[in-house]
Each structure stands twice: as structure tokens, then as C-alpha cells.
Amino acid sequence: MNMRIAAILLLGYCAGMSTPAFAQKKDKLKKGPNISLNISAKKDSVKTTYLNIGLLTNIYQLKGIGINAVSSVVQNDMTGFQISGLASITGRHASGFQLGGIANVAGGNANGIMLSGLMNVAGGKANGIQISGLGNIAGNISRGVTIGGLMNLAGNKAQGVQIAGLANIAGKSQNGIAIGGLMNVSAEKLNGAQVSTLLN
């Protein structure tokens, strides 16, 4: 029992240390350089971009395709495809497909597919498929298929299939199947199956 509590505290601490770096400031993302070509409507009060191709991008809203060699920052909502060599970041909701060499971040909800080399982070709900080399974090609910090389963390509920090399952690409840190399943790309720080598 003491080992289980220590493991939960250690994993919670590790996950807690990584989340604030992405979610400290929810008001507005910092305006940065924009080295890209954009196609947008001339008289659009919302500043929507429909096609974005370049090196570094910092735009207000994307409804369409954004492909950048280094990074892509969308201040508001992203609907469509956001692909970057290093990081794809959306200030609010991301709906569609996000691909980042290192990380994908959605400040609000992520709906669709997130693929990254290291980390996927959704500040609210993650609905769909998340696959990363290191871990996946959903601030509230993770719903769908979540595969992380090290761990998957849902702040509230994990629903669907979670597969991690080390641990799957749900802050409240887990519904579905969780397969963890070392452990699976759900603080309150479990509906489904958990498979691990050490702790469930």
C-alpha cells in the first residue's frame, strides 16, 4: 500500500511539473515572428487564415492547412491540419489533425488526431487519438485512444484505450482498457480492465 501511494505521488509530481509550462497563461499567447505565406479573407474581423506555409508562424485563427518547418502558433482556434517540424500550438481549441516533431499543445480542447515525438497536451478535453513518444496529458477528460511511450495522464476521467510504457493515470475514473508497463492508477472508480506488471 505504501509503495502504491509513493508511486502515485511520484508520477503526480512528475506530471504536475510538466503541465504548468504549457498552461500557465491562458489569456493570450505571446505575439511572435511570422515568417510564412498566408491566404486569408481581405475583410475578416476574426483574422482567419485558410492556408499557411512557412518557417515560423504566429497567426490568430486557422481554418484549413498550416505547414511550417519550425513551429506554428495559432492564437485562437485551429480547424483543419496544423503540421510543424518542432511544435504545433493552439491557444484555444484544436479540431482536426496536429503533427509536431516535439510537441502539440491545445490550450482548450483537442478533437481529432495529435501525433508528436515527445508530448501532446490538451488543457481541457482530448477527444480522439493521441500518440506521442513520451506522454499525453489531458487537463480534464481523455476520450478515445491514447498511446504514450512513457505515460498518459487525464486530470479527471480517462475513457477508451490507454497504452503507456510506464503508467496510465486518471485523476478520478477510468472507463475502458488501460495497459501500463508498470502501473495504472484511477483515484476513484474503475469500469473496465487494467493490465500492468506491478500496480493496478
Task: Give the positions of each predicted feature.
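Bacterial Sec-dependent N-terminal signal peptides
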Residues: 1-26
